[in-house]
Amino acid sequence: MCEEDVAALVVDNGSGMCKAGFAGDDAPRAVFPSIVGRPRHQGVMVGMGQKDSYVGDEAQSKRGILTLKYPIEHGIVTNWDDMEKIWHHTFYNELRVAPEEHPVLLTEAPLNPKANREKMTQIMFETFNTPAMYVAIQAVLSLYASGRTTGIVLDSGDGVSHTVPIYEGYALPHAILRLDLAGRDLTDYLMKVLTERGYSFTTTAEREIVRDIKEKLCYVALDFENEMTTAASSSSLEKSYELPDGQVITIGNERFRCPEAMFQPSFLGMEACGIQETTFNSIMKCDVDIRKDLYANTVLSGGSTMFPGIADRMQKEICALAPSTMKIKIIAPPERKYSVWIGGSILASLSTFQQMWISKQEYDESGPSIVHRKCF
């Protein structure tokens, strides 16, 4: 069996979207929602060939008749049966490959429970019979994708946000901070704010509409109070959005009030620090000698860092917290939505990485716990 001609598969399972493709490619082939939908009603049409579950885009398009569930919450897999369906869909329907013929690189949120990666390992080897696999930390991959080995990554997706300081390619576990505030919470908050305005969004299907509003119209204000004043005195910030039924809604200060919750979690009734303080606290937990390198290499990654204005605001906030002479640079790569996947594609195609894979043989000898020894 010659390993050289077999491309590894890279699967970045996010709480919101699954990104999958082949190592060495510069972008994922498949990007679809991490959703499993089940019919809400018994089928009335005879011979319609109704399935008992739908995955990804198909679930999204039939959302009106389905109950949608996300098997990954806050970066942790909470429903393994549904997770298996998502992986099955990834390999067989999206990538159209046989997983038993390719090594698979999976990703995981930092500070996840140990059982989570053991179960991932077990399913890959026992259900999908992969020849080899590896579990990589998402934020580290984002840093690789930006061409750095030292820096601090603020990775904010749909389910969880982290600040991960990395020095010479190694994450510093004692300084990693986790914030359970991310895209899904912002969507829920926008649902609540719109409900206060008299628009009702309640079902799982309607939540997806609100997510679309958030992605298309929200932005981060450089100065929140100023922006609120502007919004109150003029209609210059108002934008309209057409709902699927043709009704048009107008949103004003909600556009920046929604992402502001990342900087002020008290908006959501959370006691946590905002992303700017979390980043600062994370840097302060590191050795005093490397802080300068972290301030100068602060990399944003993940879908929830895609809001316009977020980099300038981070720059302003971190400058206010850091020592006044410190050089601060916020790096926001345009492809940051997929930078975890891109980093995985880079890593899995490095010749030096090939001895890092966990092989089927090693798994058979040691069991699922091998993952803690081979993957950090």
Swiss-Prot record:
User: Is Signal included in the keywords of this UniProt record?
Assistant: no
Query: What chemistry does it catalyse, as a reaction equation?
Result: ATP + H2O = ADP + phosphate + H(+)
Tell me the organism.
Limulus polyphemus
| Keywords from the UniProt entry | Acetylation, ATP-binding, Cytoplasm, Cytoskeleton, Hydrolase, Nucleotide-binding, Oxidation
Q: What is its EC number?
A: 3.6.4.-
Which family does the record assign? Belongs to the actin family.
Task: Tell me what this protein is called.
Answer: Actin-11
- Write the lineage as a comma-separated list: Eukaryota, Metazoa, Ecdysozoa, Arthropoda, Chelicerata
Q: In terms of one coarse class, where is the protein primarily found?
A: cytoplasm
User: Where is the PTM Methionine sulfoxide found along the chain?
Assistant: M45, M48
Question: Propeptide-annotated positions?
Answer: 1-2
